[in-house]
């Protein structure tokens, strides 16, 4: 089958601290990951019309025709994961990091390639455990369609991407955590006025609206 190009929303996800979790309890971690996929992530992807492109030991790469569907899916999975982890000790929690990008991709068979995919993977690496980072184009596409707030993390220079990426963090209702730079370090806080401008205030979306 010949490769084809198309525009798609790409969601990349992985498990924060996967090696540590596996080292502490390999069988228990694998069993919980299998349960999370069967009970939560895979059904949510199907509900929002996504296609799981590939899985790794600790990661997922998912393609959506709609960026709105991609963001809704990510937010619903992360909120459900937070509920699932509520009574789990901190050192045993399985927490996901997610990145979403909208871009031109190449589909070859069932796999996908291209800069649009690579950017999603780099956004994922910038996300905090339990968090979601998106590119500016994703924020611009969904900000007037969904009621989520976004926190501007500024331009980030990331590995193997020649241009800086403007990164936004979806605010899931928790107190704002320190911003991270491309290496995962806490970034300097912006001035108060800049911080106010950086956050797009929206009322949270209800379950029925989603």
Task: Go through the PLM ranges and name each one.
Residues 1-4, 90, 191-196:
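Short glycine/proline-enriched loop/turn "hinge" motifs that connect secondary-structure elements
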Residues 1-75, 79-80, 209-210:
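Catalytic NTP-binding/metal-coordinating core of nucleotidyl cyclase/transferase enzymes
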Residues 3-5, 47-48, 126, 149-151, ...:
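Short hydrophobic "helix-edge" motifs at membrane interfaces and signal-peptide entry regions
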Residues 14, 41, 57, 100, ...:
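Residue-level signature of catalytic and energy-coupling elements of molecular machines
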Residues 15, 105, 158, 205-208:
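Hydrophobic pocket-lining residues within nucleotide cofactor-binding pockets
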Residues 61-171:
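Catalytic beta-strand-to-alpha-helix segment of the class III nucleotidyl cyclase homology domain
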Residues 170-191:
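Juxtacatalytic C-terminal regulatory tail of Ser/Thr protein kinases
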Residues 187-210:
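Acidic, proline/glycine-rich low-complexity intrinsically disordered segments
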């Amino acid at each position: 089958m010949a490769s084809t190009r198309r525009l798609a929303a790409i969601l990349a996800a992985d498990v924060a601290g996967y090696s540590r979790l596996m080292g502490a309890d390999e069988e228990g971690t694998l069993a919980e990951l299998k349960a999370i996929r069967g009970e939560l992530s895979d059904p949510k992807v199907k509900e929002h019309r996504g296609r799981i492109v590939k899985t790794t030991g600790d990661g997922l790469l998912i393609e959506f025709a709609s960026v709105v569907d991609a963001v809704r899916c990510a937010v619903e999975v992360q909120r459900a994961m937070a509920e699932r982890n509520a009574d789990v000790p901190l050192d045993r929690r399985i927490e996901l990091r997610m990145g979403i990008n909208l871009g031109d991709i190449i589909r070859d068979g069932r796999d996908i390639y291209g800069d649009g995919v690579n950017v999603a993977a780099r956004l994922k690496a910038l996300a905090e455990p339990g968090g979601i980072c998106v590119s500016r184009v994703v924020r611009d596409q969904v900000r007037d369609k969904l009621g989520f707030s976004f926190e501007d993390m500024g331009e980030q220079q990331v590995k193997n991407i020649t241009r800086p990426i403007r990164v936004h963090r979806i605010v899931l209702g928790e107190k704002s955590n320190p911003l991270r730079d491309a290496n995962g370090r806490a970034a300097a806080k912006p001035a108060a006025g800049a911080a106010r401008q950086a956050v797009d205030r929206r009322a949270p979306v209800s379950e029925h609206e989603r």
